[in-house]
Structures are given as C-alpha cells and as structure tokens.
Amino acid sequence: MAEIQLTFPDGAQKTFEQATSLLDVAKSISTSLAKKAIAGKFNGEVVDLQQPLLEDGAIEIITKDDQAVNLTATWHTAAFVLAATLSQHYPEMQFGEVTATEDGFYYDTDNEAGQVAVTDLPEIKTEMAKLIQSGEAISRVSVSKDDAKKLFAGQTYKLALLDEVEADQVLVYQLGDYSDFSLAPMLGKVSDVKFFELLSVAGAYWQGKSSNQMLQRIYGTAYPKQEELDADLKRRQEAKERDHRVIGNQLDLFFVDPKVGAGLPYWLPNGATIRRSIERYIIDKEVANGYEHVYTPILANLDLYKQSGHWDHYREDMFPPMDMGDGEMLELRPMNCPSHIQVYKHHPRSYRELPIRIAELGMMHRYEKSGALSGLQRVREMTLNDGHTFVRPDQIQDEFKSILGLMIDVYADFNINDYTFRLSYRDPANTEKYFDDDEMWNKAQAMLKGAMDDLGLDYVEAEGEAAFYGPKLDVQTKTAMGNEETLSTIQLDFMLPERFDLHYVGEDGEMHRPVMIHRGLVSTMERFTAYLTEIYKGAFPTWLAPTQAVIIPVKNDLHYDYAKNIKDEMIKRGLRVRIDDRNEKMGYKIREAQTSKIPYTLVVGDQELAQATVSVRKYGEENAVEEASDMFINAIVAEVGNYSRDGKQHTKKINL
C-alpha cells in the first residue's frame, strides 16, 4: 500500500500507510492519548478521528481538554441523535443543513406529512434520551461520492449538499438505519452526549435564500456537565427577558405591520420619545465637538452611487432603481457618504478650514432579506448617526483619536462599558469585493493600527470585515441574545476623495487631496435603541425614559389639584410626567408603574399636601422616601441633565 508522511506539531515526521486515520496515529503514540482524543486537525482543518488520511500533511491530535472542540463535537453528536430520532418517527422527513452555532446546534428539516410543533419537542427529547441510553456506537465509513449519492437517494437536500463536496471520498456516520455526513468532529458513541435540551422550532429558507423552500429549523444544545447546561439555559431565559422585541411590546415602543412590510417599524409614542431623546443628545454632543449638522435627500441619481462604487460593490444590498421615465434613475440611498461629499464640494475649501466635520441623522434603505430581519436590530429602513470628517494627511492621527475619545464619552453617558475593539481589514484574496489599490489599503491599515498602538488599546484584527473602500475600527459589543454587533465605526477612506476629485487649497497655494474619515457614534437609531432596551432591560435611565415620573393622588377629590401643581412645575422644567387618577386601587397603580418601569412613582396624600412634599418610590426599590417637592424636582432635573442612571456623571473607560 502507498505511504504518506505526516508532520507532528513539534516538527517531527513519520511515515504511515495511506488511509491511516488520526485515531490510528493516536494509538501508535499511546493508548491513553487515543482514549482522550476526540478529533484532529489535518493541514489546519478540524477533521474526524476516523477520517482516512490520503496524502502528506500536518496533523494534530485534539483531546477532550480542548473545550471548544469538545463542545462542537458534543453539539454535532446531539444533532445527529436528533436526526436519527426524527427519522424513526417521521420516515418521510427530509434533512437539510446541520450546523453547530456559538452555543448549540440546529438541524433543518422538511416533512410534507406534518410540521414538528414546539409541543412535540418534549416527546422527541424523551426518545432521544432512550437512544442515548442505549450506548450504541456511531460507526464511520469512508465511501466514494457516487456511493454516497446512492446511500442518500431520496434525500433531496442531502444530495444537493453532496454536490457541493469537492473531495472524492465522503465520511459517512451511521446509527442504526440512519446515515449522515459533514458532521466532523463527532463523539465516539451516543452515550457521550450527557446533558442536552431541545430549545425551539423556527422557519428558515433552504440555504438562506427566500426563493427556496421554507424548512423547519430545530434548535438544541448539549453539554458534558449538567451545571453547564443549567447555566446556559439560565442565560437563555435571561436573554429572552431582555429581548427588545418582547420589551418593546410590553412597553409599547414599536411594532411592525405586515400590511406595510417587514423590516419597516412604526415608532409608537413611547419609543419615539426614547429615539427623540437619543437624537437630541447626539446632535448636541456632535455640535459641541465641532460637527455641523445637515439634511440631505434620501433619494439620489443612480449615477452618484455608480461614481462612489456602491453600485458595483454593494448592489445586492440596495433596492432596485426607480425609472422616472425620462432617462433619470433614482435610488434610495444605502449610505450617506456620497451626499456628504456633495456638501464638501459645494464650496472651495482651504487647508485652514480642515478638519471639516459633517454630521447627519440620515435615513437610509437596505435590501435586507426577510429571514435576516429582526425587530429593530435588522430593518430595511434605518436612520444612521453618521458623520464624515475631511482632513489633511497630517491631521489623520489626531482626528482619529478625537473621534475615539468622543465615542468613549458617549458610551460613558449611556453607561456602556462592555465593548471591544476590532480592526477590520480587507481580504487580500477577494479583490472583487474591495477597491483595488494595494498601496492605499496597506497605508490605511497601517495608520489605523499605528493609532491604536499609540493609544495602548487592545484590539483584534479581522480580515474580510472592511468596507469596500477602506479599513475601519469597529467597536464590538454583544446583544442580550449573545449576538455580536458593531456599536460604532471609524473608517479611513482614500478612495472616495479620489473618485469625486476632492480638493483643498494648501498652504503652498496648490490643490491637495483630503482624506475622508467615516464614523458612526452609535450605529442606527433602530439598532441602538434595541441595544439599549436590552442592556437596560427596559428600565431606561431617567433622561431616556418615555415617562420619567407618575404622580398618584391618594384621593382624587382631595389631592388631585396638588398633584397637578407638581406636574405642571415638572413639565415647566422639561420633564415628562403624568398623573394616574384612574379609579383603581393604590396598590394596583403602584405595581403598574413598576411593571411599566417608570423611574419615579410619586404618591401625594394629606401629609404631602400639608407639608409640600412627595412620597418618592424609585423604580426597583421597595421603600418610599418623603422629600420636599421642590428638592425632588431639582434633583431629577439634575439627573436628567447629567445623562446618567444615578444622577452622577460617569467617567471614561480609558483616557486618551
């Protein structure tokens, strides 16, 4: 038999027979290693222990000590057990893609005989547990691609997935009458799946394309230890309670009307108040930092986006152009930068004017697929807190640091502390996706990296995450659901100033090219509101809360006028307050104020009327305190003015 040469992590090389598996290699080293092994790497790719090795390459044995791979193998095996169980109960079921996610797995299925309901999951879980208790080993067999197609005949989606496999051999996993593939790594036997849970059922288009068949996606998770599963389920429950879609419904913040269209939210009065407060804050903050706010059209001639490059590189995310019938094609703008360039070009510019900072709360439209839409986080119409600075080359580093400092000030005002920095570069292997200028990319990426190093900030580097016209610094955070989101962005751009032939008159009297810096402080109003709703769990800080205080008179006939006087004074001071004079019990009104997450509940009765005080109960606290009404009003006005949750100005996370 032919031989292959395998290279170990320490550089040592050894010859083995062709088709040797990594498990065989582990056994040749030691029995204990083979027992601990759960997977391996071949030329950097994670593969199954029993994957036949057909050519020379570098190998690595992965043991249970590698928690990440161990979890992935656990999730793959649990998904395999799920599919094997479903195949017994639904013989006609078609199986699609199976995927290990960041915290579990899902399997896409299609069953013409009937859908799997959420209420079916407990019974399916019971049957899975029986299969796991059997302790049956999972057999592996390597077959040719043609033989695999024969094995999966009748499984439409599996055959389609096989067509995408480039290798001539396919590793097939078998358990009883059920077979599957593309699940590496997997555990050795079904009883290795110790603790698992089936979570939910949702719809998903085959391979994510809305033109394809809608399938059923069954979600689950599994862990080696019960306490790990319990912790995960607790986290998921907490995430559900923080879900901005749930809270948005409870607090009457927004809704989406299917008659109008998916991804097009209506902002209800409460949500609109929160958004308006954010917008006013942002405008004031930016103006104080040298930005000039503008309004620009949400429609533009298609030629503008052809010149900017959006039409070539971003077309799939843009709505189709509107033919005006006279040769003019109008496009809903996907980004604001070309519009701000036109503002810059409206006047001749001098080096003395730079940096020129232009900002806008600019409405944009993105052609998002329906399957990607989610509440306020992913929408088709959005308003971006956008800004563009035009600088001389010698101003780049200082302006970058200035923008980053402004961002961190904003995070402090919103009490946001959990975020990381990511330098997003182009993928040099994907030249079609990005503006093709190696010198520009290398220069811009080096500048961003140098600025971050100068500041001593930790960051990760990510290839393939840049925009098509330049690298960027992304500020990353996680939603309550555990999804990573980009909170803010700073991006260097040498391309658009060249495409639009931007100039300024230099000190030497000659024309020079400015550098453009794109930045978004808090993403879109939609996404930022969703994010804040989740991190605050709906208990917005007083300055953002739709209703900042509710006043409850003990007896309307005796105490209403006093309550109204307090309300009028608070409104005069710019506060949002209402009186609850409904004919309901006092306890009911107080509980409702708490469930509505109103920051302050004020009760006024005989004592308060006689002493010009209010009984103040802060949200989340059990006890009320008596305060002079004027002192309370002064205190809440100061709290709102400080943009904080506790009446104190928060400090920056880092000093620049």
Swiss-Prot record:
Residue ranges of domain TGS in the record: 1-63
Listed cofactors: Zn(2+)
EC primary class: ligase
GO terms classed as biological process: threonyl-tRNA aminoacylation
Positions that bind Zn(2+): C337, H388, H518
SMART domains, per database record: tRNA_SAD
CDD domains: TGS_ThrRS, ThrRS_anticodon, ThrRS_core
Keyword annotations: Aminoacyl-tRNA synthetase, ATP-binding, Cytoplasm, Ligase, Metal-binding, Nucleotide-binding, Protein biosynthesis, RNA-binding, tRNA-binding, Zinc
Recorded catalytic activity of this chain's protein: tRNA(Thr) + L-threonine + ATP = L-threonyl-tRNA(Thr) + AMP + diphosphate + H(+)
Superkingdom, taxonomy of origin: Bacteria
Record region (Catalytic): 243-541
Residues that span the membrane, as ranges: none
The UniProt record lists the keyword Transmembrane helix: no
A cellular-component GO term for this protein: cytoplasm
Main location: cytoplasm
Co-factor note (free text): Binds 1 zinc ion per subunit.
E.C. numbers: 6.1.1.3
Protein function: Catalyzes the attachment of threonine to tRNA(Thr) in a two-step reaction: L-threonine is first activated by ATP to form Thr-AMP and then transferred to the acceptor end of tRNA(Thr). Also edits incorrectly charged L-seryl-tRNA(Thr).
Subunit relationships: Homodimer.
NCBIfam families in alphabetical order: thrS
Family: Belongs to the class-II aminoacyl-tRNA synthetase family.
Family annotation (HAMAP family): Thr_tRNA_synth (MF_00184)
Name of the protein: Threonine--tRNA ligase
Provenance organism: Latilactobacillus sakei subsp. sakei (strain 23K) (Lactobacillus sakei subsp. sakei)
Annotated gene: thrS
